[in-house]
């Protein structure tokens, strides 16, 4: 026994060259481990990586879609705001034009009413003046006849003669007023 130990110790095996049995066992273990990794672990990693890539790409696509929708909504909002401002300006201008038209109509109606009232007042004044002239002619005629009969000393009871005297007197009076007015 000592002899085997000594012969083993003296036997010249190279420590750098592995034992072929050890090498076979290690290679078989590596092959089994490699098969398990390739068959089960790598597909799980690939599946996880694919899901992550899909989630990231889907998130990017969703973000781009949301950005596009937000941009479209912003453009629609701006367009609606522009349309609303244009509509407000149009309504404001229509209101101004309508107000100006109403004001012009009211001024026209006021001018027509003023002209009507003025014409009515002139007509009323003229009718009152005519009534006053008729009344005054009658009174002046009576007074003139009475005064003339006192001055002349004779009675002017004849109506035709009295009417001529009154008419002549009034004509003289109108001539004096017309001359004084000029």
From Swiss-Prot:
Q: Which InterPro entries match?
A: ATP_synth_B-like_membr_sf, ATP_synth_b/b'su_bac/chlpt, ATP_synth_F0_bsu_bac, ATP_synthase_B_chain
Superkingdom assignment:
Bacteria
Q: Which organism is it from?
A: Arthrobacter sp. (strain FB24)
Segments traversing the membrane: 25-45
Q: What's the gene?
A: atpF
What are the recorded GO MF terms, alphabetically?
Answer: proton-transporting ATP synthase activity, rotational mechanism; proton-transporting ATPase activity, rotational mechanism
Fill in the subunit field for this protein. F-type ATPases have 2 components, F(1) - the catalytic core - and F(0) - the membrane proton channel. F(1) has five subunits: alpha(3), beta(3), gamma(1), delta(1), epsilon(1). F(0) has three main subunits: a(1), b(2) and c(10-14). The alpha and beta chains form an alternating ring which encloses part of the gamma chain. F(1) is attached to F(0) by a central stalk formed by the gamma and epsilon chains, while a peripheral stalk is formed by the delta and b chains.
**Cellular component terms, GO, for this chain's entry?**
plasma membrane; proton-transporting ATP synthase complex
Family to which this protein belongs: Belongs to the ATPase B chain family.
Q: Where the protein is mainly located, per its record?
A: membrane
Q: Which PANTHER family does the record associate with it?
A: ATP SYNTHASE SUBUNIT B (PTHR33445:SF1), ATP SYNTHASE SUBUNIT B', CHLOROPLASTIC (PTHR33445)
Give the function comment from the record: F(1)F(0) ATP synthase produces ATP from ADP in the presence of a proton or sodium gradient. F-type ATPases consist of two structural domains, F(1) containing the extramembraneous catalytic core and F(0) containing the membrane proton channel, linked together by a central stalk and a peripheral stalk. During catalysis, ATP synthesis in the catalytic domain of F(1) is coupled via a rotary mechanism of the central stalk subunits to proton translocation. Component of the F(0) channel, it forms part of the peripheral stalk, linking F(1) to F(0).
Instruction: Answer whether the UniProt record assigns the keyword Cell membrane to this protein.
Output: yes
- Matching Pfam families, A to Z? ATP-synt_B
* Name of the protein: ATP synthase subunit b
Keyword field? ATP synthesis, Cell membrane, CF(0), Hydrogen ion transport, Ion transport, Membrane, Transmembrane, Transmembrane helix, Transport
Membrane-topology descriptor:
Single-pass membrane protein
Q: Where in or outside the cell is it found?
A: Cell membrane
